[in-house]
Amino acid sequence: MKNLAPGLLLAMPQLGDPNFYRSVVLMLEHSESGSMGLVINRGAPLTLGELARGQNLGIAAGRKEHSVYLGGPVEPQRGFVLHDDTEQREKHSVLPGLFLSVTLDALGPLLTNPNPRLRFCLGYAGWGPRQLESEIAAGSWLFTEATAEAVLGHEPSKLWDTTLRGMGVDPAMLVMGRGMN
């Protein structure tokens, strides 16, 4: 079994689940017992300013209008912060230059500091044992390597197209039901 974490999964047109239409998923865990990732390019109808206000947290002025992202349909009330703040104490390394924090104690300093790049996701995408491998074999997902720049540095609304083009795939050549034409 190829380890897909960390890596990026790109949803192909034939994946029928609307939760994942043109989604880019950062894989955080992939093992015999299942897989977990965060959709990093699907905005939620919520800003970081609204989130901070709801949690009674301070926030840097430049962050207030930043989008919150729908990380996936599982546990949508649970928050995950992807960031590049090397000074953050409560963090897990995802890949070089990219960290994951999951506590409110970690969120406060990340919101008030205007410097680290971050992406806040609500919920996550999860797969049972061998489920993701079956979906990949059916042509529902395309895998590529992940970088901190791909996760934090690209415009989320263009990430699916940008990543495909970076792989040498023309999105216009993708055909429903067959993956790449």
Swiss-Prot record:
<dbReference type="GO" id="GO:0005829">
    <property type="term" value="C:cytosol"/>
</dbReference>
<protein>
    <recommendedName>
        <fullName>UPF0301 protein MXAN_2022</fullName>
    </recommendedName>
</protein>
<comment type="similarity">
    <text>Belongs to the UPF0301 (AlgH) family.</text>
</comment>
<dbReference type="Pfam" id="PF02622">
    <property type="entry name" value="DUF179"/>
</dbReference>
<dbReference type="InterPro" id="IPR003774">
    <property type="entry name" value="AlgH-like"/>
</dbReference>
